[in-house]
């Protein structure tokens, strides 16, 4: 398999983002044939001393986990991106650093995304959860469903709530983080922190010295110290794609950015594809609900972003969930990944038809894509009404919001 291209995630704060909204977006660049599912897990109480089984290892469970909505490769436990009931959003990026990532199975970066969402009521709390679990359990194991070789990475995270974001970058159990409260920030699959660090592992600098990567003299620049000597990734055009927007950034701007293939933000190559995308809108006014949009299908330029709002009685959406193989899943048996089961969910299968038409028939494909975008626009307009309304949100009206959007999309494709 060729080297993985960069994934991108972005956050924009007011006043760069419009109407007092924090806007968050993420593209997940993964192997072309990998299916991502979108799954809701309700808040739950857990027995004392119970365990939670992550992708490769089990760890201690906490007494209570928050409700989450996540987009994840269907073979693993964690998440590429997601949100929780408190308006915390997290996405991660696989990164290469001077220190090779561990192939020994531990927590995956994606596991830490989900654990942060389940356990963190604010962005800072989620950050603290992730770094403490990193210290305790480490990170490692195969990031891809591939029996032939182990693709292991270090991880970077963008952790966002209504008030602030944290950029967290990790090297093994060592880490540094920067707090962001204004402007636009992008992380992609390389280190980005330099000399501004608002929190760090207590032994980070002494570790860098022990490896001969820093003399201990002069200013400590995280990226310079820990980036690989030969870093061929160029994230420049992608990073600039949102920052160079002259107008205020809206949810539509973020979606357009994630659909941009020319800048490299949207990946469509021989081995890799943007397999799922997500956008979240977090109003700084707490009387307005956070709204989270997920595609659940590959290639955002040929997909529909569908809205979801956390309420007490969410209608589950089995049509975006992959089949469950239980203990027979090749990802759970050792040696792992000896087979690749069909993980396509109902929405994914319906969407394959649309992708084929858009790729093969110019006229019909253009009309189909135009109709898809019109469907999406109707959803965006309905959400805009909710955000600008002075009336309190009626939970009964939005509990089946994502379900209805998925159902409409599948019927449309059929």
Swiss-Prot record:
Cell compartments where the protein resides: Cytoplasm
Purpose: Regulates exocytosis in mast cells. Increases both the extent of secretion and the sensitivity of mast cells to stimulation with calcium.
GO biological process: exocytosis; proteolysis; regulation of synaptic vesicle cycle
Alphabetic keyword roster: Acetylation, Cytoplasm, Exocytosis
A Pfam family that the UniProt record links to this protein: Peptidase_C69
Family membership: Belongs to the peptidase C69 family. Secernin subfamily.
Single GO cellular component term: nuclear membrane
Organism (species): Homo sapiens (Human)
GO molecular function: cysteine-type exopeptidase activity; dipeptidase activity
Miscellaneous: 'Secern' is an archaic English term meaning 'secrete'.
Active site, renumbered: 9
Protein's name in the database: Secernin-1
N-acetylalanine modified-residue sites: 2
């Amino acid at each position: 398999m060729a080297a993985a291209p960069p994934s991108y995630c972005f956050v924009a704060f007011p006043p760069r983002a419009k109407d007092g909204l924090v806007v968050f977006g993420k593209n997940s660049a993964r192997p072309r044939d990998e299916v991502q599912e979108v799954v809701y897990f309700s808040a739950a109480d857990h027995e004392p001393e119970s365990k939670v089984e992550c992708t490769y290892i089990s760890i201690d469970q906490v007494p209570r986990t928050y409700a989450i909505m996540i987009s994840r490769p269907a073979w693993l436990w964690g998440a590429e991106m997601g949100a929780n009931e408190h308006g915390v959003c997290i996405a991660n990026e696989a990164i290469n650093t001077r220190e090779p990532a561990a192939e020994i199975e531990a927590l995956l970066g994606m596991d830490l995304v989900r654990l942060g969402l389940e356990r963190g009521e604010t962005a800072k709390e989620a950050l603290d959860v992730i770094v403490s679990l990193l210290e305790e359990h480490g990170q490692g194991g195969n990031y891809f469903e591939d029996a032939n070789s182990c693709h292991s990475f270090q991880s970077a995270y963008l952790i966002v709530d209504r008030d602030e974001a944290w950029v967290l970058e990790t090297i093994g159990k060592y880490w540094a983080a920067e707090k962001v409260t204004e402007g636009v920030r992008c992380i992609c699959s390389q280190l980005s922190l330099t000399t501004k660090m608002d929190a760090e592992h207590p032994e980070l600098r002494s570790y860098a010295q022990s490896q001969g990567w820093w003399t201990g003299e002069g200013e400590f620049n995280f990226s310079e110290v820990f980036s690989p000597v030969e870093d061929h990734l160029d994230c420049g055009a992608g990073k600039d794609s949102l920052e160079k927007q002259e107008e205020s950034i809206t949810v539509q701007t973020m979606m357009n950015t994630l659909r941009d293939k020319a800048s490299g933000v949207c990946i469509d190559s021989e081995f890799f594809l943007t397999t799922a995308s997500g956008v979240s809108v977090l109003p700084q006014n707490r009387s307005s609900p956070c709204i989270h949009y997920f595609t659940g299908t590959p290639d955002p330029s040929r997909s529909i972003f569908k809205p979801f709002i956390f309420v007490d009685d969410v209608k589950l959406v089995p049509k975006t969930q992959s089949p469950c193989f239980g203990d027979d899943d090749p990802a759970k048996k050792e040696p792992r990944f000896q087979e690749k089961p069909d993980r396509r969910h109902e929405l994914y299968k319906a969407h394959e038809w649309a992708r084929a038409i858009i790729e093969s028939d110019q006229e019909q494909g253009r009309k189909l894509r135009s109709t898809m975008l019109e469907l999406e626009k109707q959803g965006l307009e309905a959400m805009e009404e909710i955000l600008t309304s002075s009336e309190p949100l009626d939970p009964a009206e939005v509990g089946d919001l994502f379900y209805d959007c998925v159902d409409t999309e599948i019927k449309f494709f059929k």
